[in-house]
């Protein structure tokens, strides 16, 4: 079975200033990858390269198909850090925003099947109660949950999420990460997620990927927590992340930090 994401030799620069250098990795079906690293390290740019939203050099395959030939966008749900929908003032309802996530939709009619998908996605994200409200009248946290529903509406096999919990309150964050964990564990949805919230999401993540212009680390949570080499490479950031996992009880059994349970 081909990798869900395969990247080889990715490079990107803004006006000749390197942002990403020689990034290579593979994400397998069923992985839950936490993409971490310092601000300005190229994490968001990397996601945009994978989705064809930025153009760099190197090779990208999605579900075994070269990015330039990839057509099955319904297999991918994407939640950007700054969504164009959030920045637009066009008066659309929350339900209409979710409907936008059906990439295969054509024409003005909405089928019964599409409505069922919208209902299911909004039910999962607890946004059904304000389906008819204007999107921009919602709070920032409510908007974020609607945008998650839009990412889920096509029932994707891969979710790519850029700091999705930033605007959420504690209760919504817990719901959000529990939902992602369930989608990964029970439905086999592959997840690639930029996060600084390693405590709450740490119990679900299976692999960590650390990017700071270059790929510094890619491996399992166990390798991340137990390896002295990782701590030496990443320094204070690694220790902060491991401490966060430890404090929430999500370090693997036998982790050298003492947090395994």
Feature names for model-found ranges:
Residues 207-220:
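H-loop (His-switch) and adjacent beta-strand-loop-beta switch element
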Residues 155:
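Conserved catalytic motifs of ABC-family nucleotide-binding domains
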Residues 58-72:
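Conserved ABC transporter NBD signature motif
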Residues 222, 226-228, 232-261:
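ABC ATPase nucleotide-binding domains
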Residues 159-162:
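Catalytic Walker B motif of ABC-type/P-loop ATPase nucleotide-binding domains
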């Amino acid at each position: 079975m081909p990798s869900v994401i395969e990247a080889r030799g990715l490079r990107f620069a803004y006006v000749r200033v390197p942002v990403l250098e020689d990034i290579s990795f593979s994400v397998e079906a069923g992985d839950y990858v936490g993409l971490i690293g310092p601000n300005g390290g190229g994490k968001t740019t990397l996601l945009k390269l994978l989705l064809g939203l930025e153009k760099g050099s190197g090779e990208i395959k999605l579900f075994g198909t070269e990015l330039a030939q990839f057509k099955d966008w319904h297999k991918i749900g994407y939640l950007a850090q700054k969504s164009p929908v959030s920045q637009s003032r066009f008066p659309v309802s929350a339900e209409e925003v979710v409907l936008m996530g059906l990439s295969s939709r054509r024409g003005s009619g909405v089928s019964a099947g599409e409505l069922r998908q919208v209902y299911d996605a909004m039910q999962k994200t607890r946004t059904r109660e304000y389906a008819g409200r204007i999107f921009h009248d919602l709070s920032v946290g409510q908007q974020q949950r609607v945008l998650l529903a839009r990412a889920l509406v096509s029932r994707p096999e891969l979710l790519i999420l850029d700091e999705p919990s930033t605007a959420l309150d504690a209760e919504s964050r817990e719901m959000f990460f529990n939902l992602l964990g369930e989608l990964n564990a029970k439905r086999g949805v592959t997840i690639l997620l930029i996060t600084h919230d390693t405590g709450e999401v740490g119990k679900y993540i299976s692999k960590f990927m650390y990017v700071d212009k270059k790929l510094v680390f890619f491996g399992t949570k166990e390798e991340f927590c137990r390896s002295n080499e990782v701590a030496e490479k990443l320094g204070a950031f690694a220790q902060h992340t491991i401490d966060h996992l430890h404090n929430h009880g999500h370090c693997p059994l036998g982790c050298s930090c003492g947090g395994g349970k």
